[in-house]
């Protein structure tokens, strides 16, 4: 499922809604293909991830340069310059369904996460459940995710990602792994997804079924980065002079940083992901903002103020 184009083709076979797309080859008339799909279009790396190898194109004039730029970035980042054209939705939400499967034929979905707050096509605030998903959408999207997993014969933890516009949704990609934002799902369903993933790898059956899952409250996660929002979120590496996670709000901190650590240019500049759970979305947002404000971090320029203002 690391190949996004192959994944789209499989999802079409499974009856999962997909956006129009076509692989860019040497024989393809790219300008004609984009006209057929309809602008705006997205040039997208098939082996991509993390927002790399992607270009939004509004008009024909910028298409060829965008294709070449995406191919170069894809080759440098993934060792594969395969790119494709896909219809771009100007107004949409990034909503994903957490799935779990075992080797005994059991499959469940753990409801949705909203991941629309992004910069440079990378998520920075995630929440569950999505404020835009009705019970009807949740049921249909969950069924589509299960259909996708069945088509793949999937076991272990994974994510089926969709674009949502109004009450319609389209397949985006499958992430065949546990994602950074999985804690928000754990918080609202009260299950340990890492534990289930390990149990499945050991040949055990899932410890719960679909009927035993329900949504309790609201969870939000923020990604605290060493970066400068005023300079287009440019990474800001350097020493961590002081790091003291807040002790209020019963927040969950996932981090490998401590006082004295060095944030380098060789790796992603994430300092921590911070997750809170509360009875309502409003309470969760306020609680997370307060947790971030009362976390002590010195020596680095961070996106903390941006996160607090966004919340």
Residue ranges and their predicted role:
Residues 1-160, 164-181:
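N-terminal beta-alpha lobe that positions the nucleotide/phosphoryl donor
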Residues 18-20, 157-158, 204-210, 231-235, ...:
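Acidic/polar loop patches that form or flank catalytic/metal-binding clefts of enzymes
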Residues 54-56, 87, 133, 270-279, ...:
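Short, well-ordered beta-strand elements within core beta-sheets of diverse protein domains
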Residues 150, 260-276:
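Cofactor-binding beta-sheet edge motifs in enzyme active sites
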Residues 211-267:
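Glycine-rich active-site loop/lid that clamps phosphate-bearing ligands
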Residues 283-286:
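Channel- or pocket-lining gating/hinge segments that regulate access to a cavity or pore
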